[in-house]
Amino acid sequence: MITRLSHLFLRTLRDDPADAEVPSHKLLVRAGYVRRVAPGVYSWLPLGLRVLRKVEDVVRAEMNAIGGQEISLPALLPRDPYETTNRWTEYGDSLFRLHDRKGADYLLGPTHEELFALTVKGEYNSYKDLPVTLYQIQTKYRDEERPRAGILRGREFVMKDSYSFDLDEDGLKASYNAHREAYQRIFDRLGVKYVIVAATSGAMGGSASEEFLADSPVGEDTYVICRESGYAANVEAVVTPAPEPQPIEGRPAAVVHDTPDTPTIASLVEWANAAGIAEQFGRPVTAADTLKNVMVKLRHPDGKTEIVGIGVPGDREVDDKRLGASVEPAEVELLTDADFAANPFLVKGYIGPKALQENGIRYLVDPRVGTGTAWITGADSPGKHVVGLIAGRDFTPDGTIEAAEVRDGDPSPDGRGTLEAARGIEIGHIFQLGYKYTDAFEVDVLGENGKPVRLIMGSYGIGVSRMVAVIAEQQHDEKGLRWPAAVAPFDVHVVVANKDEAARTGAEQVVAGLDAQGLDVLFDDRTASPGVKFKDAELLGMPWVVVIGRGWADGTVELRNRFTGEAENVPAAEAVATVVARIRG
């Protein structure tokens, strides 16, 4: 197919948009692939839509290859199914909610577990119908608080979501692994550099969960990897190795000290070293010897609130994402002055485990706060701390929580090396959901023995529209976009760089020849200057550019590789065959 630039609905820009923060956003707007309509909402123009459709085609082909069947469910969904699973509340402000003229509540679908479960329940009733995998490629909606980075994080986006239904856990694992392998083929075909990491399930529920993260310095997700073993996990999913229990018998009793003006960890450490505590330790006291107690308020889905104490080693900050993932579906809030006033035993800067437990405050600690570990921490009185407080003797936590930050050099949970932090963009997420949704809607079939069998689900998502931005993010250079052949809007971009009639006639011949070979050709037949055409060719990013200019009179054309920047002159008579050979390998 031939598309003439003189007829294409396209306007390129020379300057970056004022609101653009990352390269993909800047280039996709400048190159005329997308246009902003509202915060987090974008129009797809012809070139952008061609890339999007090609990504969809790759995803669709691989889903079909594992037996997936494509359907399309509505984006406008009733409230009731989401009330049944409690996600009407759990999703909080990220749901777009609306009501019809009769006052009935609806939402714009962020994901479709409920509807797929109900669809299978309505159609299947026998074990003979299973297993089945259904999928859709559809626009989703989430009311992001801070949409950013163009189509990387929008309020409206295209997603492939698929759902497997099996008779037992072995079947679920097989479906999960089939999707995992399909995702690897998809991302490999799209030319994306990615890593698979262990992840949390969040509001989706279920057990096993993995994310596919595209390597990118602009990614919002932090993950860690152990180069020695290959272990990788989203930072929210990292499990802190717990120390071996230490003996308690015969250990010195904890001692309360006057520690005036020491409300911070730094001031407490300074006091400890000046007061001779270092001699007791046989080394200088560090922040890692202190126990920091952070107070938060959890707001549960039923609206009830709970004050909780979080104990972490003093050399660690609380990671908001890890804390949030650990307490989902509850939301985390900071305590207000009114909360402290209502609970006078909470002495700012001097909070310790004792007062929390005496007053019925749930106290969760970092796994490093193991049995027999000794700490310097608050004594629940202004200007007082306790030294040598031993976990399991002087206080007993209500449980552990993964809330402390993960740092470079931390031991890997598999015990085979140390962790290194990196950033990535989530492009896929797969879940073994289990029975959360089939239990909620009683999705049963008759088993081989004539008794009901509850189906078990898996859920698998790919950010299809996000993939366009991810590819642009990973593949661009200082001149513009560089599309891999699998998703490029056109196979080849032909530029007429000479107003000579013979060159234009020759270009028409070359373009016709490429078209006859089944290639998609973008033909720059405009009367613009060669400089403008070359800049646009670099900005638009087709993998191959054919330049027909002064060399035509000498019987040559120039072939440019957009990825390598290499250019070669080839005989005009062989131009079509050479281009086809380069493209098809």
Curated annotation (Swiss-Prot):
<dbReference type="GO" id="GO:0002161">
    <property type="term" value="F:aminoacyl-tRNA deacylase activity"/>
</dbReference>
<dbReference type="InterPro" id="IPR050062">
    <property type="entry name" value="Pro-tRNA_synthetase"/>
</dbReference>
<dbReference type="InterPro" id="IPR002314">
    <property type="entry name" value="aa-tRNA-synt_IIb"/>
</dbReference>
<comment type="subunit">
    <text>Homodimer.</text>
</comment>
<keyword id="KW-0648">Protein biosynthesis</keyword>
<dbReference type="GO" id="GO:0004827">
    <property type="term" value="F:proline-tRNA ligase activity"/>
</dbReference>
<dbReference type="InterPro" id="IPR045864">
    <property type="entry name" value="aa-tRNA-synth_II/BPL/LPL"/>
</dbReference>
<protein>
    <recommendedName>
        <fullName>Proline--tRNA ligase</fullName>
        <ecNumber>6.1.1.15</ecNumber>
    </recommendedName>
</protein>
<dbReference type="Pfam" id="PF00587">
    <property type="entry name" value="tRNA-synt_2b"/>
</dbReference>
<dbReference type="InterPro" id="IPR036754">
    <property type="entry name" value="YbaK/aa-tRNA-synt-asso_dom_sf"/>
</dbReference>
<dbReference type="InterPro" id="IPR036621">
    <property type="entry name" value="Anticodon-bd_dom_sf"/>
</dbReference>
<dbReference type="InterPro" id="IPR023717">
    <property type="entry name" value="Pro-tRNA-Synthase_IIa_type1"/>
</dbReference>
<dbReference type="Pfam" id="PF03129">
    <property type="entry name" value="HGTP_anticodon"/>
</dbReference>
<dbReference type="GO" id="GO:0005829">
    <property type="term" value="C:cytosol"/>
</dbReference>
<keyword id="KW-0436">Ligase</keyword>
<keyword id="KW-0547">Nucleotide-binding</keyword>
<dbReference type="GO" id="GO:0005524">
    <property type="term" value="F:ATP binding"/>
</dbReference>
<keyword id="KW-0963">Cytoplasm</keyword>
<dbReference type="InterPro" id="IPR006195">
    <property type="entry name" value="aa-tRNA-synth_II"/>
</dbReference>
<dbReference type="InterPro" id="IPR004500">
    <property type="entry name" value="Pro-tRNA-synth_IIa_bac-type"/>
</dbReference>
<comment type="function">
    <text>Catalyzes the attachment of proline to tRNA(Pro) in a two-step reaction: proline is first activated by ATP to form Pro-AMP and then transferred to the acceptor end of tRNA(Pro). As ProRS can inadvertently accommodate and process non-cognate amino acids such as alanine and cysteine, to avoid such errors it has two additional distinct editing activities against alanine. One activity is designated as 'pretransfer' editing and involves the tRNA(Pro)-independent hydrolysis of activated Ala-AMP.</text>
</comment>
<dbReference type="InterPro" id="IPR007214">
    <property type="entry name" value="YbaK/aa-tRNA-synth-assoc-dom"/>
</dbReference>
<dbReference type="GO" id="GO:0006433">
    <property type="term" value="P:prolyl-tRNA aminoacylation"/>
</dbReference>
<dbReference type="InterPro" id="IPR044140">
    <property type="entry name" value="ProRS_anticodon_short"/>
</dbReference>
<dbReference type="InterPro" id="IPR002316">
    <property type="entry name" value="Pro-tRNA-ligase_IIa"/>
</dbReference>
<keyword id="KW-0067">ATP-binding</keyword>
<dbReference type="Pfam" id="PF04073">
    <property type="entry name" value="tRNA_edit"/>
</dbReference>
<comment type="similarity">
    <text>Belongs to the class-II aminoacyl-tRNA synthetase family. ProS type 1 subfamily.</text>
</comment>
<keyword id="KW-0030">Aminoacyl-tRNA synthetase</keyword>
<dbReference type="InterPro" id="IPR004154">
    <property type="entry name" value="Anticodon-bd"/>
</dbReference>
<dbReference type="InterPro" id="IPR033730">
    <property type="entry name" value="ProRS_core_prok"/>
</dbReference>
